[in-house]
């Protein structure tokens, strides 16, 4: 029986196979975007002994359904910034989370915080798209990618001068992503295969 993750990845990989855009052209276009704000730098510059908060903008989820029907990214991003967030995470997946690239652009235009594009990255073109929509970091999910993909995606993110946040769920995945060069690691308490949450 397939999981939420399997279904979402199948959808994105099908879309990727139908994407005929030139990778070289996308890399060139991504290089023309204004400089990133420094996602990792913002997290690391949080005052000593204070937690750096990545505040999230999400309209819905596969497991919980609609979360906020009238969410306004510009307003929410400003409120998060006023509240002391170090960075933002914006869902751009429309099919399963109700997000869009416009949500990210709107949030970024309304505040000065660096932004993580939270989506399912399955192709090098996705990394380019992340930069083209002016995000400052790309999300890479260890459970969704093999070592070769992780290494290539991190390398391209570095080339485009954006940060890569690599998401893991357990210690084995931590060891895996460190080997391929992950610099920022996020721990998801939710197992993306079962969608169960483990708070231990």
What label would you give each PLM region?
Residues 54-56, 141, 186-188:
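Non-cysteine beta-strand/loop elements that form the S-adenosyl-L-methionine
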Residues 38-49, 97-122, 142, 150-167, ...:
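Alpha-helix-loop-beta-strand connector modules within alpha/beta enzyme cores
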Residues 56-60, 67-71, 94-98, 117-125, ...:
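Glycine-rich beta-to-alpha transition loops that act as phosphate-gripper elements at the mouths
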Residues 2-68:
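An N-cap/entry alpha-helix motif that binds or orients negatively charged groups
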Residues 68-91, 110, 124-137, 150-164, ...:
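Alpha/beta enzyme core
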Residues 24-34, 62-68, 86-106, 142, ...:
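Glycine-rich, proline-tolerant flexible connector loops at the mouths of alpha/beta enzymes
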């Amino acid at each position: 029986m397939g999981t939420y993750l399997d279904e979402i990845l199948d959808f994105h990989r099908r879309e990727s196979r139908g994407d005929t855009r030139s990778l070289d052209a996308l890399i060139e276009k991504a290089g023309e975007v204004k400089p990133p704000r420094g996602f990792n730098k913002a997290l690391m510059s949080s005052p000593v002994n204070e937690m750096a908060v990545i505040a999230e903008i999400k309209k819905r989820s596969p497991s919980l359904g609609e979360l906020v029907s009238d969410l306004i990214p510009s307003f929410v991003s400003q409120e998060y910034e006023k509240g002391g967030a170090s960075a933002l995470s914006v869902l751009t997946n429309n099919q399963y989370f109700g997000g869009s690239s416009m949500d990210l652009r709107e949030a970024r235009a309304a505040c000065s915080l660096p932004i993580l594009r939270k989506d399912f990255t399955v192709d090098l073109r996705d990394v380019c798209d992340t930069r083209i929509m002016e995000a400052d970091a790309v999300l890479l999910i260890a459970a969704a990618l093999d070592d070769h993909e992780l290494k290539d995606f991190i390398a391209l993110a570095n080339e485009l001068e954006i940060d890569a946040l690599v998401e893991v769920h357990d210690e084995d995945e931590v060891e895996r992503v460190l080997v391929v060069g992950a610099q920022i690691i996020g721990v998801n308490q939710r197992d993306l295969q079962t969608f169960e949450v483990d708070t231990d």
